[in-house]
């Protein structure tokens, strides 16, 4: 595995593989790798000649009161895990490498960001698409891999790829979970022992809401109540419970089509997000 920190090194390696017409799978991350990231890397390994992973904690996607400085980092461990997952090139730039000067041009996302996490984190997705635009130009991937735990991010990136005619395929991978259902996340390390025991309630609550809809419940207020019940028994504070069309992230006139139930819950030092995405048959549509 090649570990590179400078853009010129990365571009030279990518050029060598492009000349051989190799397919390139790209897994962008902020590091502190867990099984979710490694699943993305393994998918990329199975589907491409070359696998590139980036580790970059992007300051543009953190708000003024968020955890940029304290975001967990362990580069030595990350390098070992990336190598074991079959990564060929690990790109680990610092902030000065990616933003040599204060950016004179950044991206602005106009749709799909005024709900869910974007509602409480203004500018977050602008930072995400700005850094991804840079990374996509540098890596020139055939396929780029993202986890559906961050479903809003996947929806925004999907729109960005289409709007800017990036010649790449977005591969969205189902959320990787612990045995008790908790979505794997770098921020899970912030949970106390008690909070860690409570946290699986998020997924149980989401599945309860999904089950109710699949069994015919169409009263949205009742679905919210069902999802809320399990969370209220924890020490977490509900940030949001929302139901939208997916990937458009628009309010539903009726519960039909591709639907997302998404949730965010704040514990003492961790804000956890999770979701379920599923198809709801329209009236008269046959179940498959």
From Swiss-Prot:
Binding site for ATP: 30-37, 147-150, 176, 184-187
Membrane-spanning residues: none
Gene3D superfamilies reported for this sequence: HUPs (3.40.50.620), Pantoate-beta-alanine ligase, C-terminal domain (3.30.1300.10)
Broadest EC class assigned to this enzyme: ligase
Binding site for (R)-pantoate: 61, 153
GO cellular component: cytosol
Catalytic activities: (R)-pantoate + beta-alanine + ATP = (R)-pantothenate + AMP + diphosphate + H(+)
Binding site for beta-alanine: 61
EC number(s) given by UniProt: 6.3.2.1
One of the protein's GO biological processes: pantothenate biosynthetic process
Subcellular location, record wording: Cytoplasm
Chief place of localization: cytoplasm
Pathway per the UniProt entry: Cofactor biosynthesis; (R)-pantothenate biosynthesis; (R)-pantothenate from (R)-pantoate and beta-alanine: step 1/1
Leader peptide range in chain numbering: none
UniProt KW ATP-binding keyword: yes
List of catalytic residues: 37
Family in the record: Belongs to the pantothenate synthetase family.
Additional remark text: The reaction proceeds by a bi uni uni bi ping pong mechanism.
Function text: Catalyzes the condensation of pantoate with beta-alanine in an ATP-dependent reaction via a pantoyl-adenylate intermediate.
UniProt-recorded name of the protein: Pantothenate synthetase
């Amino acid at each position: 595995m090649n570990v590179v920190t400078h853009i010129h090194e990365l571009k030279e390696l990518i050029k060598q593989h492009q000349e051989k017409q190799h397919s390139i799978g790209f897994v962008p991350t902020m590091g502190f790798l867990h099984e979710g990231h490694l699943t993305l890397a393994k998918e990329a390994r199975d589907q491409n000649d070359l696998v590139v992973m980036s580790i970059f904690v992007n300051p543009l996607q953190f708000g003024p009161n968020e955890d940029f400085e304290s975001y967990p980092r362990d580069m030595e461990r990350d390098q070992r895990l990336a190598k074991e997952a079959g990564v060929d090139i690990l790109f680990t730039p610092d902030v000065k490498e990616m933003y040599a000067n204060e950016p004179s041009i950044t991206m602005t996302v106009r749709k799909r960001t005024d709900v869910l996490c974007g509602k409480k984190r203004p500018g977050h997705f602008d930072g995400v698409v700005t850094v991804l635009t840079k990374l996509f130009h540098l890596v020139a991937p055939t396929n780029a891999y993202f986890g559906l735990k961050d479903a809003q991010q996947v929806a925004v990136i999907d729109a960005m790829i289409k709007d800017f005619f990036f010649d790449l395929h977005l591969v969205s991978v189902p959320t990787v979970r612990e045995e008790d259902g908790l979505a794997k996340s770098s921020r899970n390390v912030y949970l106390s022992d008690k909070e860690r025991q409570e946290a699986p309630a998020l997924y149980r609550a989401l599945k309860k809401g999904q089950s109710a809809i699949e069994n015919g419940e169409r009263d949205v207020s009742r679905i919210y109540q069902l999802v809320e019940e399990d969370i209220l028994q924890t020490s977490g504070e509900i940030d949001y419970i929302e139901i939208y069309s997916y990937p458009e992230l628009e309010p539903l006139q009726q519960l039909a089509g591709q639907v997302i139930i998404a949730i965010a819950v704040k514990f003492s030092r961790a804000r956890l997000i999770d979701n379920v995405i599923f198809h709801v048959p329209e009236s008269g549509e046959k179940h498959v």
